[in-house]
Regions:
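Bacterial N-terminal signal peptides
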Residues: 1-12
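Catalytic glycan-binding domains that act on GlcNAc-containing polysaccharides
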Residues: 17-141
């Protein structure tokens, strides 16, 4: 766990350094695939039909998250919009994850991505600890 923490700190320092030098790595340049795949395993074990309350699909996306993605797209003057049915589509679920990261995680913090996916943008570290550890365990494999 110490090694993982050091790795994440190093990534965050590098991202912060890049941001101050004007070389900000955009979310599109960050390879979020391993993080998304680990989240998918924790959330649904890869079942695109998974459902728990209002959360559905491989990434257990809520209607509120779909609405937030559409608000972001609207602010970006994009005509694209997501539907509630898109939560069952693996590729579109990953697109929504990436869109959220691009806005709410500009430094591409892996820890922030994992914790906020579980606890929202104003997550509490203590409440997201078990989830974070589950995802990190899969990332280490």
């Amino acid at each position: 766990m110490v090694l993982v923490s050091m790795l994440m700190l190093t990534l965050e320092i590098h991202a912060a350094s890049a941001a101050t030098s004007g070389n900000v790595s955009s979310t599109s340049e960050m390879d979020w695939t391993p993080v998304m795949d680990a989240i998918i395993q924790v959330e649904s074990k890869g079942d695109p039909k998974a459902k728990s309350g209002n959360s559905v699909g491989v990434m257990q996306i809520t209607p509120i998250l779909v609405a937030e993605c559409n608000n972001i797209l609207k602010r970006k003057k994009s005509k694209k919009r997501y539907t509630l049915a898109d939560r069952y589509n693996v590729a579109k679920s990953k697109e929504m994850f990436l869109l959220i990261q691009s806005v709410y995680n500009p430094l591409n913090s892996i820890e922030r991505a994992i914790r906020s996916w579980n606890g929202g943008n104003h997550y509490k570290k203590k409440r997201t600890q078990r989830y974070f550890e589950k995802v990190m365990k899969l990332l280490k494999k």
